[in-house]
UniProtKB/Swiss-Prot annotation:
This is Undecaprenyl-diphosphatase. Bacitracin is thought to be involved in the inhibition of peptidoglycan synthesis by sequestering undecaprenyl diphosphate, thereby reducing the pool of lipid carrier available. It is a multi-pass membrane protein. Keywords: Antibiotic resistance, Cell inner membrane, Cell membrane, Cell shape, Cell wall biogenesis/degradation, Hydrolase, Membrane, Peptidoglycan synthesis, Transmembrane, Transmembrane helix. It comes from Halorhodospira halophila (strain DSM 244 / SL1) (Ectothiorhodospira halophila (strain DSM 244 / SL1)).
Length: 287
């Protein structure tokens, strides 16, 4: 893979991983576009390309850790405090908010995995169908537009329960389909469940950490089984990782800015325009 392609793919992953417009759809569309014009890059289903996509996803994981470092440190500290109190005295010392949130997050990831593994074959068919990608982009835009019409939400993380965690986990599972944005689905359904915008965002992006880690593990196993990594460009992997992480920090801060101001409909117009371009054949894809 040429370094300029690694930079381009890293930029796209970094921008669209957090903007609620589906990073997977953009990566798929860009990869098809590059291949259709005979640019030097591996096939999307090759072990090398799967590994590259895995690495840039880990890069965006670094973005989350950097942006939410204070909150993550607080969460880790108090979760360990809750766990220590339970191990030492057989009970929690005070309300176990952080331990409870940890368990709810794991529940969300569990339901994401159930949906993802159950519908994996269906989602893979969408990857090869630009018309289906266009449809899911239209749906993403509709959800974003509707979200800005919601009245102010009142629930905080203390009021988050099993039902909310399950709903968000299922929504994230369906977001594995190209065109359905992970951040959009989790934030929208968090708001639908009554969470305040700030907490819907924080839960969404905190949830991305174990989700990306689990997906990385599964993809690493797949890459190992495929083999054929002798031609992998380490320079391209490092470049994609660094670019995705750096661009992801800016992208994440941008989406938080718009979310807190109830302006997600800005992104709905973009995904509708992209869907229209696909349907009208303005984006020529070799499918």
């Amino acid at each position: 893979m040429a370094l300029w392609i690694a930079v381009l793919l890293g930029v796209v992953q970094g921008i669209f991983m957090f903007l609620p417009v589906s990073s997977t759809a953009h990566m798929v569309l860009l990869e098809h576009w590059l291949i259709g014009r005979d640019h030097p890059m591996p096939a999307p289903e090759s072990a090398e390309m799967i590994l590259f996509n895995l690495v840039v996803h880990v890069g965006t994981l670094v973005s989350i850790v950097v942006v939410f470092a204070p909150s993550l440190l607080r969460f880790t500290r108090y979760s360990l405090r809750d766990a220590y109190g339970w191990a030492r005295a057989g009970r929690f010392q005070g309300p176990p908010l952080y331990a409870r949130l940890f368990l709810l997050g794991m529940l969300s990831v569990l339901f994401t995995g159930v949906v993802g593994l159950t519908l994996k074959a269906t989602f893979e068919q969408v990857f090869a169908n630009p018309w289906m990608i266009a449809f899911t982009l239209i749906l993403t835009g509709a959800l974003l537009f509707w979200t800005d019409k919601l009245p102010p939400r009142r629930r905080g993380l203390r009021q988050t329960g099993v039902g909310t965690a399950t709903l968000i986990g299922v929504a994230q599972g369906f977001a594995l389909m190209p065109g359905l944005s992970r951040s959009a689905m989790t934030i929208v359904f968090g708001l639908f469940a009554g969470l305040k915008r700030r907490w819907a965002a924080e839960y969404s992006f905190f949830l991305a950490i174990p989700t990306i880690c689990a997906a990385t593990l599964l993809q690493a196993i797949e890459v190992y089984q495929l083999g054929g990594l002798e031609s992998v460009s380490v320079a391209a992997l490092i470049t994609g990782f660094v670019v995705a992480a750096g661009v992801g920090i800016v992208s994440l801060k941008l989406v938080i800015y718009f979310l807190y101001r109830a302006q997600l409909k800005v992104f709905s117009f973009y995904v509708w325009a992209l869907a229209a371009a696909i349907l009208l054949g303005w984006i020529d894809l070799p499918i």
